[in-house]
Amino acid sequence: MNKITRTGSLVLSLTLALGLFSGCGSAEPGSTPGPDKVYVPQYTKLEGLAGGINLAETAEGRLFLTAEVESGPVLKKYQKYDENGEPLTDAEGKPVMEEESVTENVPAVFTLDAAGGGLARFEGYSVSALPEGAEGSVELAAIRPLAGGGLAALERLSYSLPQEEVYRESCLLRIFDAKGAETAKREFGPGSEEGGESPSFTAMAADAQGRIFLMDQTGGRVLAVDGSGAELGAVRADEQTYLQGLFQSAAGEVYAMTPKPEGGGIDLHAIDLGSKKLGQTVHSLSYEAYGAYSGGGGYDACYNEGESFCALRLGAQPERLLSWINCDINSSSVVRGFVSEGGEVLCLLNDYDGGGGAYLVRLVPTPADQVKPKTTLSLACNYLDYDVRRAVLDFNRKNAEFRIEVRDYSQYNTDEDYGAGLTKLTTEIGAGSVPDILLTNGIPMESFAAKGLFTDLWPFIEADSRFGGREGLVQPFFNALSREGKLYEITGGFTLQTLAGPSSVVGTQPGWSFDQLRAALDKMPQGCEVFSRGWTRREVFANVCSLSLGSFVDWKNGVCRFDTGEFADLLRFTELFPEEYKWDDDDFSPKNGEEARIREGRQMLRQMYINSLYSYSYDASLYGKAGMTLIGYPGVPGSGAVFSYSGGLAISEACKNKNVAWDFISYCLDPDNQQDAFGGLPTNKAVFDKLFRDNIGEKMTSYSDDGAEVETVFTEDYARSIQDVINSTVTVSGRTSGTLSSIINEEAEGFFAGQKSADEVARNIQNRASIYVNEQR
């Protein structure tokens, strides 16, 4: 057996290059008190793989995995073509072939024991060869360990032959014994199945009786075969049911996964070959779960749910075994986690963030007093995004004294209430249980900041030489984000959201009133509409008018101003739009698309979401000689534009290590981390300025509604227009609480239903909102 070189099983300290040492509590993920035991990871690098791990399974205390390895020189034959791209044939009409010796990466199967030793090639398996002269690929789509150390491998072949114009696809089931001898093979291809279709097998499992189950996702069925490949029967799902996967329970029974009919979550069904139907649902996983699989350790299934690694015994409640990130493991890198018979959590991962390579990680339960303690800072969030996850991992690996422990409240979401986690987090903060660091997505920061729960970050920015004080940042954005001169959160990217219109009609200076918008519309051709097709009154109110609702509330002083006339104007603006839009009567051809409507004067304004510069010059070209002005939303102060962002990072006023917390959250302002701009325009001034400099004069290629390729140039005038609007924008969207939004929407419905005037609705909102806002102080 070909032994693969591996490193020793090491507990790597923070001072080593990978810096992957950590401890994570075996109690509920995110618990702040030190638990009696923590998981300590031991890393084994898997050498000899040409790439990362692709598939992983477990059975009988061993792990099976697939990865690519470098093959020796292979003689490949290819169809030869002439200079015009036509296939060459000989005098007999046969294809002329050419030969080439190449080295390729090919799929291979490996096994290793759960203790981390004995990584070895499963020598019996080598990828199937395509027919001679064929061009295509062979994919190792699934593997399943069998009783006694055997293996079932499922390959998908896709290829074409020179003498044929048809593209062939088939699936090949191959069965091996523990010594690697191939004992059976069966091909499923066109003509081998009912209806002549080639099945699309995408998952495989095996039961205690030695039966192998193949999931045909396209055909909506699960096919059972015996150890020789002979068909035993099939179970079909109904037409409305989509098969997601298979797994084998601890008792050796096979279960199928399907989406919950009511949406969200995964249902688990026993497979009943006798009735040829899926059995009743035996358990339902949360909509947060990433599919179940055979995970070992006496559990029926394991799965990931957000940052949590979970295990399930059918008939009992799922167990959250650990949080990947609190073990300093990037959940995005985990191929699969397993549980050993001794209770250790194992995972196979591909190290994308470090030096590369694949690893087996054993997370060993260890008494907490045997692990070097660190001071912990808590970070709370409702979903952990990729950038923050990566920053937490980097901080924890490099800092010898402090670590950040993540509490992801999305774990409390349910199929009945997707917002349960956010509600719990918001309630806890309101009650005074504030984390050291907060990811602010969805959090009513206006009311919490007014209560003094979070720290002003301007002093930290001014004292940080890395950024050059306030001048080192895009100040208009952060000034708009500030409350009464205090900045409570920072972020690495933002979007400029505005309306664009023809300069010849709306003028050249951004910012206008509702009356000015109506006057401009009167100048447009008869029948011209304000926005693109499909907008209704309620949609305009929810998506456009709501952008500046936060400006009607002063949370600190408990003052509302919905009754000043501006809010009533906002409601009356929606009268320009229909109650309902009749999509059945619409023309969806390019001639009725937004671009054609703007060019022909049938649409006055275009919504702009400027989070990059790539398409701006194309958008401007739509208005032709009339020119384009970023006029903004009516009634919004300043430029009429608003800033939006996906969420920020804040520090609690109660945090005892604010400087350490700042060292962490300020990663989002660092120039090196803003090259990708966090999904928007960068907030670091140097990166922001460079973005504009680099794009001036650049040719941009776009595609029109009718598919035509259009090339435009981003000019200095375009750059100046965007920057001028940014410099005069003073509003950030979405700055209101969910409860306040509900009050506004409830009262506004009376206006949309024709039961109340705009002024009546404004007065009612003023009364209810004032009571609510003062209750929150």
Label every model-predicted segment:
Residues 25-75, 82-101, 110, 114-116, ...:
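Conserved N-terminal structural module of periplasmic/extracytoplasmic solute-binding proteins
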Residues 443-498, 515, 627-634:
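Hinge/lid segment of periplasmic solute-binding proteins
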Residues 177-179, 183, 462, 482-588, ...:
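Helix-loop-helix "hinge/cap" segment bordering the ligand-binding cleft or interdomain interface
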